[in-house]
Amino acid sequence: MRIDIISVLPKIIESPFKHSILKRAQEKRLVEIYIHSLREYSTDKHHRVDDYPFGGGSGMVLQCEPIDRAISSLQLQRNYDEIIYTSPDGETFNQQIANDLSICYNLIILCGHYKGIDYRIREHLITREISIGDYVLTGGELAAVVICDTIVRLIPGVINDEQSALSDSFQDNLLAPPIYTRPSNYKGWIVPDILLSGHKAKIKDWELQQSIDRTKRLRPDL
C-alpha cells in the first residue's frame, strides 16, 4: 500500500509515522507513506495557497490550483483507489471503512485547513470525504494520522499477531471484552475465575457475553 498525504503544515504529522506500528510497517515495506507540502505546488512567489471566500465571510479557503496540481502530479505516476478529503462534513470514520480502505493499493489523503477547500475540488477530484467525529479541528492533519494508523494495522503482516487486530473493538460492531494480566489478585482486585480456568470454549462464551453487555451499556447506538 502507498499513502500520499497532502497538507499545508506537513511537519505537524511527521512524528507519528516515525514510531510504533506505523514505523514498523514502513520498515517491513508493507506500506509507503509520503507527506507532501501543498505550498510546493503553489505558483505564487510567496507560496500562498489560500484566499478570501467569494461572497464574504470570515476565514480563508484553500485554492483550487495548488490542490489540483498536487493531486494531478501524483495521478500521473499511478492510479489511486480513493482520493480522501478529511472534513467534518464527511461520513463518520468507523471500523468498516477502515477495513475497506486497508485492502486498497494507493490512497491520497487531502488535509483540510482554515475554513476548508474550494468546493470545486470536492465536486471534481475528491472521491470520498471522511470525518473522525462531530467536532472541528484546526486542520485535517490529525484526522489523516488517525485514518492511517487504523488502516495500516489491518494490513497482513503489520501486526505479528494478526488475530489481535481482528479481535479489536468494533470489528463485529461490539466493544471488546475486559482484559486482564498478572497478577491475578492486586490489592484485592480479582481477575474473573473463568479467565483462569483454562476452558477455552467457556472463556470465549464469557468474552462474547461481556462484549454484548458492554456494548448495550456503553454504546447502545452500535
Swiss-Prot record:
Keywords: Cytoplasm, Methyltransferase, S-adenosyl-L-methionine, Transferase, tRNA processing. It comes from the Bacteria. Its main location: cytoplasm. GO terms for cellular component: cytosol. HAMAP family: TrmD. Specifically methylates guanosine-37 in various tRNAs. The gene is trmD. NCBIfam families: PRK00026.1, trmD. S-adenosyl-L-methionine binds at residues 112, 132-137. The keyword Methyltransferase applies. SUPFAM superfamilies: alpha/beta knot. CDD domains: TrmD-like (cd18080). Its EC number is 2.1.1.228. Belongs to the RNA methyltransferase TrmD family. It comes from Azobacteroides pseudotrichonymphae genomovar. CFP2. Pfam families: tRNA_m1G_MT (PF01746). It catalyses: guanosine(37) in tRNA + S-adenosyl-L-methionine = N(1)-methylguanosine(37) in tRNA + S-adenosyl-L-homocysteine + H(+). It is found in: Cytoplasm. The lineage of its organism: Bacteria, Pseudomonadati, Bacteroidota, Bacteroidia, Bacteroidales. This is tRNA (guanine-N(1)-)-methyltransferase. Homodimer.
